[in-house]
């Protein structure tokens, strides 16, 4: 189970490494979208290494 506030390490420990990462760098922070494509797609959104949103598709 992934929750808002998890760190990158906590996510990787829970569900493994993402299949791909989309990264956007802003002036003061980095936003990433981690994509897991096994089964139903799952998207994990992180800002500065902390989960801010979780999206499940399917």
Enumerate the language-model features and the residues they cover.
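Residues within mature, well-folded domains
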Residues: 1-58
């Amino acid at each position: 189970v992934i929750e808002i506030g998890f760190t990158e390490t906590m996510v990787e420990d829970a569900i493994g490494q993402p299949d791909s990462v989309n990264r956007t760098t802003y002036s003061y922070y980095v936003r990433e979208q981690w994509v897991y494509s096994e089964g139903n797609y799952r998207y994990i959104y992180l800002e500065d290494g902390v989960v801010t949103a979780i999206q499940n598709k399917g």
